[in-house]
Amino acid sequence: LKCNRLIPPFWKTCPEGKNLCYKMTMRLAPKVPVKRGCIDVCPKSSLLIKYMCCNTNKCN
């Protein structure tokens, strides 16, 4: 699986066991990603932070 880094077009190949790409954004600025990368379990979103997870190449 390949996931985008914080600044596209850079990306990285995920290590074994981390089979989701994720993007973390602040709810007040949803178009500005704070973090991107590979993860094993999608974290729950909160009042301030929103997580978007997916399982295809460079979908974050």
Swiss-Prot record:
UniProt-annotated location(s): Secreted; Target cell membrane
Disulfides per UniProt: 3-21, 14-38, 42-53, 54-59
Domain of life: Eukaryota
Keyword Secreted: yes
InterPro entries (UniProt xref): Cytotoxin_Cobra (IPR003572), Snake_3FTx (IPR003571), Snake_toxin-like_sf (IPR045860), Snake_toxin_con_site (IPR018354), Toxin_cobra-type (IPR054131)
CC per GO annotation: extracellular region; membrane; other organism cell membrane
CDD domains recorded: TFP_snake_toxin
Entry comment describing in which tissues the protein is expressed: Expressed by the venom gland.
GO function terms (MF aspect): toxin activity
Record-level GO BP terms: killing of cells of another organism
Pfam families according to UniProt: Toxin_cobra-type
Coiled-coil zones: none
Keyword NADP: no
Keywords annotated in UniProt: Cardiotoxin, Cytolysis, Disulfide bond, Membrane, Secreted, Target cell membrane, Target membrane, Toxin
Family, as annotated: Belongs to the three-finger toxin family. Short-chain subfamily. Type IA cytotoxin sub-subfamily.
Function: Shows cytolytic activity on many different cells by forming pore in lipid membranes. In vivo, increases heart rate or kills the animal by cardiac arrest. In addition, it binds to heparin with high affinity, interacts with Kv channel-interacting protein 1 (KCNIP1) in a calcium-independent manner, and binds to integrin alpha-V/beta-3 (ITGAV/ITGB3) with moderate affinity.
Subunit-level organization: Monomer in solution; Homodimer and oligomer in the presence of negatively charged lipids forming a pore with a size ranging between 20 and 30 Angstroms.
Entry protein name: Cytotoxin 3
Species assigned in the record: Naja mossambica
